[in-house]
């Protein structure tokens, strides 16, 4: 049987971020809704045509979005929180996404283990969904005019939608409300002549999946009554223990991710129904490297022996990679030739299918093999780095003294010491200086003088506010990963390699392609400038190895653990240079530590083992007198607290203001012994917290954690705030800390416990 091809979604925002510009123009009032929608429709059409020209047989439709595809489905299903029901159309859609005066936005969180963020639907107890699929069906009709029978509508599964939502009701009861709406939609698609519908159900690959059997079986039984073939799509991992019953669901086909987990082993063990289509996700939709055709073809031929009706496809939507590697003319040719962005992945899918179908693709395969050989010559292993890793000993991952003995050797501060997380407002003037320097319009000396002036101003303001521990402000940094990656060998940078993070926000992840080497100090100059303006301690500021790795496109030729340890060695040398320059405190931030957790809990220990090891390697060489800080901006610590403690950071600052002290309580209940920076106010809000509000937050915190363990800080960096918001907020924070400190000295100097 002839193998076909399919896509599950395509790159977003446009090659030149056209949708980002249109959205921000619309939000600012410079662009009308008609112009915004025209831009969106044009980009959506371009995506279809690109896939059509690549020869894809089944092309995803409905995956593109103005803001977020989960928000789209909540809107189409009529799952509108009551606070937004007075609005309609784009006003309501963007209010749900971004909030407006008196109307808080939906919560935003990570889409599984990717770096994309989705908006969390809110399903109120008495919700009575009132669907409107007009927009979705219009997209399908437009696609049919271009793609014909290749049109493959993408529908987010009701089970996945509910599992990702905030809801208080019973899953089965909520599902019974939604399933008739889904069935009606499928019947409308059938009437349009759609040959097959993709139902995306990624929740099945998570640890939750095994407990959802009853709900999933009920869903697909009811959806089957619509009379249109359903193709169940999973991605991001293997199905694990759910595999044997998922493949028995009443569906026409099932798509599986063969690039993560152990999917091929599951097929070998349990087989696959001969009468179903197997969507083989063999082209990795989340990395940027070309496949090795001979290896993938061997797997595809084995699969074809089990499932004759086979489709070759990316492992997931291509929204997680940039549009076109051919645009990156500035990259060295050997590197560029082995990169595969969305357009190149379409070509890879088509090539693999042609080869599987017996066409002569030997010349193309030989060319790819030659490109990889050229790349290997361009980026050979670095013997010094490999030897340094081989020479690592257990003591390299440990501080010289345990925490209790380090504590007395470190800088002594008043009770409830105050500090910030690191960044301060980046004004238009600062961004202009960086842009001019990048374009070569100002010299390095002129640029550094401008940055130094900002650092001096920042130090002066912090001293006037009365903070105990200062930071230099990070004015030279555009991004906490890109800044360091640009100073390390082994990372490459794109000009057009943007991917959507959320809404109009795009990120341009560095590409980790070779062994990591630090040619020279990365942060010492700015630290010295800052420290020269004050007698108070200034923290050195670094991004941790796991965050550097998780927010980049990693290599595929060596394990992630090895890549993290290489980065850690570079950071270890930076910590030593900061100490030599006079730093007595160094902060190594790891906001992405938790984000990298595998989707299956049984795989957490392996990941956390090397992730913690990487942090300990980066910081283990620090002198006992050097206080190591780390910051983690998420609110769920309970299930990984033992690993947080194993980091052995002297001070852990947390995001606590929006969690009702839940984070602090988790830490206290676990018996965490190290110092904790209580994030006492929400930097994501422009509102200036009052002294009384911060006092309340601190008093609540001290009911769980003793004063000698407590630091006081905002819950995250201040980069996106304005000075007129930052200064009064920090003044109130310092005033609250001083007031409470004086009260404690008078009454209970040893602190309070619950």
Curated annotation (Swiss-Prot):
What family name appears in the similarity comment? Belongs to the vitamin-B12 independent methionine synthase family.
What's the catalysed reaction? 5-methyltetrahydropteroyltri-L-glutamate + L-homocysteine = tetrahydropteroyltri-L-glutamate + L-methionine
Task: Report the Pfam families cross-referenced here.
Answer: Meth_synt_1 (PF08267), Meth_synt_2 (PF01717)
One annotated GO molecular function is: zinc ion binding
In its UniProt entry, what is this protein called? 5-methyltetrahydropteroyltriglutamate--homocysteine methyltransferase
**EC annotation?**
2.1.1.14
Q: Which domain of life is it from?
A: Bacteria
- Amino-acid biosynthesis listed as a keyword: yes
State the needed cofactors, names only: Zn(2+)
One GO term under biological process is:
methylation
Function field = Catalyzes the transfer of a methyl group from 5-methyltetrahydrofolate to homocysteine resulting in methionine formation.
Q: Which residues form the active site?
A: 684 (proton donor)
Write down the PANTHER family for this protein, in alphabetical order: 5-METHYLTETRAHYDROPTEROYLTRIGLUTAMATE--HOMOCYSTEINE METHYLTRANSFERASE
Q: Which residues bind Zn(2+)?
A: 631, 633, 655, 716
Give the record's cofactor note, including how many are bound: Binds 1 zinc ion per subunit.
Pathway per its UniProt entry is: Amino-acid biosynthesis; L-methionine biosynthesis via de novo pathway; L-methionine from L-homocysteine (MetE route): step 1/1
């Amino acid at each position: 049987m002839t193998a076909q091809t399919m896509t599950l979604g395509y790159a977003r925002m446009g090659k030149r971020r056209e949708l980002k510009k249109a959205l921000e123009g619309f939000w600012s009032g410079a662009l009308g809704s008609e112009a915004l929608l025209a831009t969106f429709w044009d980009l959506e059409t371009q995506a279809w045509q690109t896939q059509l020209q690549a020869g894809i047989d089944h092309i995803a439709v409905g995956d593109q979005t103005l803001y977020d595809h989960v928000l789209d489905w909540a809107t189409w299903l009529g799952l509108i929180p009551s606070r937004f029901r007075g609005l309609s159309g784009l006003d309501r859609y963007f209010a749900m996404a971004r909030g407006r005066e008196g109307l808080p936005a939906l919560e935003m969180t990570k889409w599984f283990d990717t770096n994309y963020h989705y908006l969390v639907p809110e399903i109120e107890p008495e919700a009575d969904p009132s669907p409107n699929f007009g927009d979705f069906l219009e997209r399908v009709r437009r696609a049919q005019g271009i793609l014909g029978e290749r049109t493959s509508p993408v529908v987010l599964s009701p089970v996945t939608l509910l599992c990702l939502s905030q809801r208080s009701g019973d899953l089965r009861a909520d599902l019974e409300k939604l399933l008739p709406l889904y069935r009606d939609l499928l019947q409308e698609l059938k009437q349009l002549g759609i040959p097959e519908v993709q139902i995306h159900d990624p929740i099945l690959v998570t640890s939750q999946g095994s407990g959802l059997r009853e709900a999933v079986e009920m869903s697909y039984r009811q959806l089957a009554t619509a009379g249109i073939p359903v193709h169940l799509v999973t991605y991001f991992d293997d199905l694990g223990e759910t595999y044997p019953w998922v493949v028995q669901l009443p569906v026409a086909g099932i798509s599986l991710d063969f690039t993560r987990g152990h999917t091929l082993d599951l097929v070998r063990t349990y087989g696959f129904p001969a009468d179903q289509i197997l969507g083989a996700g063999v082209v990795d939709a989340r990395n940027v490297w070309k496949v090795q055709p001979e290896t993938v073809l061997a797997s595809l031929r084995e699969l074809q022996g089990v499932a004759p009706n086979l489709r070759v496809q990316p492992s997931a939507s291509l929204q997680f990679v940039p549009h076109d590697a051919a645009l990156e003319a500035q990259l060295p040719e050997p590197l560029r030739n082995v990169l595969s962005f969305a357009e190149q992945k379409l070509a890879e899918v088509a090539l693999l299918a042609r080869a599987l179908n017996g066409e002569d693709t030997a010349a193309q395969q030989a060319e790819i093999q030659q490109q990889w050989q050229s790349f290997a010559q361009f980026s050979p292993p670095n013997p010094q780095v490999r030897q340094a890793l081989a020479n690592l000993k257990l003591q390299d991952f440990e501080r010289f003294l345990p925490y209790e003995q380090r504590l007395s050797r470190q800088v002594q501060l008043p009770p409830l010491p105050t500090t910030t997380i690191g960044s301060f407002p980046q004004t238009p003037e600062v961004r202009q200086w960086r842009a001019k320097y990048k374009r070569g319009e100002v010299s390095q000396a002129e640029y550094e003088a401008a940055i130094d002036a900002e650092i001096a101003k920042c130090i002066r303001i912090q001293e006037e506010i009365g903070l105990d521990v200062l930071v230099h402000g990070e004015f030279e940094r555009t991004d906490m990963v890109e800044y360091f990656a640009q100073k390390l060998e082994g990372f490459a940078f794109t000009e057009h390699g943007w991917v959507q993070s959320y809404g109009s926000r795009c990120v341009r992840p560095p590409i980790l392609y070779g062994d990591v080497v630090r040619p020279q100090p990365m942060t010492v100059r700015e630290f010295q400038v800052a420290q020269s303006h004050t007698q108070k301690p200034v923290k050195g500021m670094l991004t941790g190895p796991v965050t550097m790795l998780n927010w980049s496109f990693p290599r595929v030729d060596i394990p992630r653990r090895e890549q993290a340890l290489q980065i850690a060695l570079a950071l270890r040398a930076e910590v030593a240079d900061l100490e030599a320059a006079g730093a007595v405190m160094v902060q190594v931030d790891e906001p992405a530590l938790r984000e990298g957790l595998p989707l299956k809990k049984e795989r957490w220990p392996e990941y956390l083992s090397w992730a913690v090891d990487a942090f300990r390697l980066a910081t283990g060489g620090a002198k006992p007198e050097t206080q190591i800080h780390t910051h983690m901006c998420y609110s769920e610590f309970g299930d990984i607290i033992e690993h947080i403690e194993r980091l052995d950071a002297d001070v852990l600052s947390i995001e606590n203001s929006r969690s009702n002290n839940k984070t602090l309580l988790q830490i206290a209940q676990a018996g965490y012994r190290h110092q904790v920076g209580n994030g006492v106010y929400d930097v994501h809000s422009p509102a200036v917290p009052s002294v009384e509000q911060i006092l309340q937050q601190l008093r609540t915190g001290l009911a769980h954690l003793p004063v000698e363990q407590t630091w006081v800080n905002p819950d995250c960096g201040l980069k996106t705030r304005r000075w007129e918001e930052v200064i009064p907020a920090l003044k109130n924070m310092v005033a609250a800390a001083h007031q409470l400190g004086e009260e404690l000295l008078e009454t209970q100097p040893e602190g309070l416990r619950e």
